[in-house]
Design a protein with these regions (language model features):
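Residue-level detector of alpha-helix boundaries and kinks
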Residues: 9, 48, 52, 86, ...
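Short glycine-rich or small-residue beta-strand-to-loop segments that form or flank ligand, phosphate
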Residues: 82-88
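Acyl-thioester C-C bond-transforming condensing/cleaving domain
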Residues: 57, 64-79, 90-166
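Conserved active-site "lid/cap" helical segment
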Residues: 1-82
Length: 166
C-alpha cells in the first residue's frame, strides 16, 4: 500500500497539505495501482535521469507486449502495419518509442511513424484521431496506436507541488 510511503514523504509539510494529499490518494477509487517501479523505488532519492532510464526500459517492454498481443488478437503480423503512432507523455526518449518498436518487432522500414509526446492527457485521443485521419485518406492501410503512460517515473521526491503528485 502506498499510503504509508506518502505519509512518510509528507513529514514536515503543513497539515492542510497532508489532508489534501491523503484525500486525493484515498478518494481516488483506485483499489490496485500498477507501476513500472516498486513503491520503494518511487520514493527513493533518485534523479530524473535515473527514473527516465527506468521509464525507457519499461515503456519499451510494455509497448512491445501490448502491440504483440493486439496484433495476435487481430491475426496480423508486425510487418502488416503501415502507420505506427506511439503516445507517451511521461518520459523522454530519443529515438522515440516507435523506433524501438519498429526495430525490435522487425516492422517495415518504410512504415509511417508518428510519436505523440508532450501533449498531456489529450495525447491518447489525439493519437486515435491521427490514426483515423490516416485511414480515411488510405482506406486499405493498417494503423497501430500504442500508448504507454508511467507517471510514477516522473515523481520527484523533493517536489511537493500538486503537479508532481497528480
Amino acid at each position: 500500500d502506498i499510503i504509508p510511503y506518502v505519509k512518510n514523504w509528507m513529514r514536515g509539510q503543513d497539515n492542510r497539505f497532508k489532508r489534501k494529499v491523503l484525500k486525493l490518494f484515498k478518494g481516488s477509487g483506485v483499489k490496485r495501482r500498477y507501476s513500472i517501479m516498486d513503491v520503494e523505488e518511487v520514493f527513493s532519492k533518485s534523479s530524473f535521469e535515473e527514473k527516465n532510464n527506468i521509464y525507457i526500459h519499461e515503456a519499451t517492454k510494455l509497448a512491445e507486449q501490448s502491440l504483440k498481443k493486439s496484433l495476435k488478437k487481430a491475426n496480423l503480423l508486425p510487418s502488416d502495419i503501415d502507420y505506427i503512432i506511439t503516445v507517451s507523455c511521461t518520459g523522454f526518449m530519443i529515438p522515440s518509442l516507435d523506433a524501438y518498436l519498429i526495430n525490435n518487432l522487425q516492422m517495415k522500414q518504410d512504415i509511417v511513424r508518428l510519436p505523440v509526446t508532450e501533449m498531456g492527457c489529450v495525447a491518447g485521443v489525439s493519437g486515435i484521431i491521427y490514426g483515423k485521419n490516416f485511414l480515411n485518406a488510405n482506406p486499405n492501410k493498417r494503423v497501430a496506436v500504442v500508448s504507454v503512460e508511467a507517471p510514477t517515473a516522473t515523481f520527484q521526491l523533493d517536489n511537493f507541488s500538486m503537479d508532481n503528485i497528480a
